[in-house]
């Protein structure tokens, strides 16, 4: 995945809302549902354009990246240097292209049926095969999460933030800070869920 700024994603969403949704809808009672990276894009959109949605559900939103046990500051310096030296379109460490291998056991899903459904769709459609992040995407993601926390107070609509207790991709600290800084956010923690809450077990 390559992007220079999450503003590009936000602009795309605004274009979609303006040219498709609002023109074809018979109601203006829009509810936003967004997951993970989409949750970051959704949060930024709510901060920049608060007039579009009446309420929102953010599922495991990316509001702080998780870099295992490595210091956040050092990681960011390495990423900036990689971009500076022209490696922005190279995969960041640990990232790779879609290889068509089923890795349910290592995935962020807890439902094999739901995982397999998405996996087969991804295998069949090349446009679904976005996978590993580049250095540029990682840098853009860090910048986006900082922006989201800084402007959280601009989100005034009711937001349900669903937090996964066993998330290996997203650091929940960012979600906690956002929930406190935004004006009307309810945080619901799913203690035993992995990152993809909607792909968890039926009991969750």
Where are these regions (language model features)?
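Short beta-strand/loop motif that positions the catalytic acidic residue
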Residues: 155, 161-163, 167
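Short alpha-helix in the alpha/beta-hydrolase fold that links the catalytic acid
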Residues: 157, 170-180
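Alpha/beta-hydrolase fold nucleophile elbow
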Residues: 24-36
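Alpha/beta-hydrolase active-site loop
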Residues: 2-21
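Conserved alpha/beta-hydrolase "nucleophile elbow" surrounding the catalytic nucleophile
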Residues: 34-39, 164
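Alpha/beta-hydrolase-fold enzymes
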Residues: 41-129
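Catalytic histidine-centered segment of alpha/beta-hydrolase-like enzymes
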Residues: 193-204
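Active-site nucleophile elbow and catalytic-triad environment of alpha/beta-hydrolase enzymes
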Residues: 132-152
